[in-house]
Amino acid sequence: MTNNQPSNACRKSVPSSSKHIKHLFRHTVSSSDRHDVQQYLLDSEAELCRYQAEVNRLKAKITVVETRMGGLKRKIRKYRTLLSPVYRLPSEIWAEVFLFFCEGESLIPLKTPAVMVVSRVCGRWRDIALSTPRIWSTISLRFEGWTKGNGGRLDRLQSLLVSFLQRSKNMPLTVNLNSLRVEKQDEIDGVVKTLEGLLNHSTRWQHLDCTHSLLALPAFQSLRNRLPELKSLYVESGMRDNSSSLFHDCPSLTSISISPDSWSDSDFPLHQMKTLSLRRSYAPAALAVLRSCTNAYQLEMHSIGGMSRPDTDHIILPKIRQLTITAENEEDAMTVFQFSTLQSLTSLEIRRSSVNSVDWNRWDLGPVKDFFLRSSCALTSLKIGSVPLSDEETIQLLLLMPTLTNLSIEEYPKHGKNKIVTDAFLQLLSSDEDELASSFLPSLNHLDLIVHLSSLHIPSLIHAIASRAPDDMGNISESSCGLRSVTLTVMAKEKPDMSPFFELQCFGDAGLRMNIFHKTIC
């Protein structure tokens, strides 16, 4: 039971003479009275000291109790967080979150890497970060910031590299090395010295992204025959030099992205390639590389064209299934169609490299039609982006693709009006009893249109979608015939009035996957 009674010191009464002293206010104070008053004051002050001591004792006790109470409240708040859903996440999920958070970040001066920020939040996060080598296995550098200003920056970079290499343990490494743009030789020497530790771990490199000028440095010659785990390689353009043979003996290399003008077909184990990306090169150099890639199934051609001759040898690539062409002009778009046969092709994407490009105003589809007749491929996916085609030309091209299930068309933003998705195109897209219409894309399941609002004939679009909708839209599956999904993006200079498209939304309510967006253009 709590004792709330005051201490003995506080229970002492004030001296009994206080009544006598009180009467002195009405009488003359004699010498003996003065002595009594002085004694009373001495006794009262002593009593007051005892009271103050008791108050201080109680205040101290209150302070102690309040301190303990505050500490308990903090613990309650802290421990209550353990009941929140985030603490039910297993460590494996947190590791995936950290991987996503740290993805694509470069090591730059004056900024703590995201993975280290994560590891300093709390003890559990630190344990997860240090026990997950994958989040330390991507090393991305931008040299410019490390070589300018404070000379101690390279020392910090070296320390960071040591931490990443140690904490990644034996995990395969993804190495991104930005262009080396330094003017002084001592700066180059400093960077190379800093990278020695990374080069010593080249046997763990799985993905490498670097520049041709960096590979030309003498220190990088040690990579020759020391890249057993390298699977993918991206090299920026550069002049052909002694770095060309660095990757000749890479038993795991299956994906490269290069400019063929900087290499020869003997610089890589091309027969191993599964995915291939060729960039900014004349056609002969690119075709020389392609000729040996007989096992590749994915091919990307970015600005590849020109300098080709009519007598150029024809190439047959029997396993290519996916082809992406990014073109600046008609020559770029024609290279593959003129000089190759791809009988296994199922997916094709063709787009203009830049909306500001003015070099591509027309496209002769003769070689393209010849390509499809020659290849006899069963194309199932086609993406057309900002290419100079009319509706009639596009229709003639699509008539060669009866197996097409996915169609994506993006109009050229600079035209201001639709050249492909016209009223005539939409009327033909409508599936009805007309013989030509019934043979036009009979297997189409997914339609994606990016069009100008100003010249879009909405009633024809609604009719086309309605005519191709499955009979049972409420039960659409992957085996359903007809359209399963439609994505429409309308381009306009200002945010458009979307009310005319409300009628389209009824298809979404009925079960068709219907998405409508707008895109502001200049």
Predicted regions and their residues:
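Leucine-rich repeat
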Residues: 1-522
